């Protein structure tokens, strides 16, 4: 590769890095770094199946969606307190700000956490506090999207919708995540109708 080509590529990268950006689809649980996962595991007395963060980082080479989801849900187990959700959200928003993201819209799926005994208040209050601090300190605009899991039941999705009602005015939209097969969004028509009836916008849904 010629010197001029290398310089051109570097100039383009520098230009791209400096541009203001919007990140409109990111799942907070999937942003959990190996170092933070281990820190939260220690804080909450949770054993992980890896010896250290370096061994965990080696697993971040995914063969398919399911291999990603397996690690994704393993990470969910270390998020227990409002402080945990605050730290996760604040770390992500700091990284986004460093990358010149000026607007970030973040999904979080309460069902995994509620199923393991985490109060919905801990999740929502931790995430929203971090969003407010990031806006005040860094000037980044952040929106929260609540996601339900397609591998769970529609009834559970409707319960989740009810559980986040106290924060409805701070939720930018409702979406859906998880393994697409064999879980088509058509199983959740009543859920989507209910979300629309309550005034929520519907965000991007994996098809």
Task: Tell where the protein language model's regions lie, with residue ranges.
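Metal-cofactor-binding active-site regions of metalloenzymes
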Residues: 2-200
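Conserved small/polar residues in nucleotide/adenosyl-binding loops
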Residues: 206-207
């Amino acid at each position: 590769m010629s010197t001029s080509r290398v310089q051109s590529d570097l100039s383009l990268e520098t230009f791209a890095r400096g541009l203001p950006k919007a990140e409109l689809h990111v799942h907070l649980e999937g942003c959990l770094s190996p170092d933070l996962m281990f820190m939260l595991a220690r804080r909450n007395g949770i054993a992980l199946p890896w010896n250290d963060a370096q061994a965990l980082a080696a697993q971040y080479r995914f063969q398919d969606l399911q291999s990603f989801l397996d690690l994704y849900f393993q990470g969910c187990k270390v998020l227990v307190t409002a402080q945990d959700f605050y730290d996760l959200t604040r770390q992500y928003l700091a990284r986004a700000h460093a990358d010149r993201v000026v607007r970030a819209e973040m999904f979080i799926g309460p069902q995994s956490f509620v199923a393991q005994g985490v109060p919905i208040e801990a999740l929502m209050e931790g995430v929203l506090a971090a969003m407010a601090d990031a806006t005040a300190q860094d000037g980044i605009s952040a929106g929260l999207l609540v996601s339900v899991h397609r591998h769970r039941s529609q009834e559970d999705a409707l319960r989740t919708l009810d559980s986040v009602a106290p924060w409805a005015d701070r939720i930018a939209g409702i979406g859906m995540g998880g393994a697409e097969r064999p879980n088509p969004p058509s199983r959740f028509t009543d859920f989507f109708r209910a979300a629309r009836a309550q005034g929520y916008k519907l965000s991007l849904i994996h098809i």
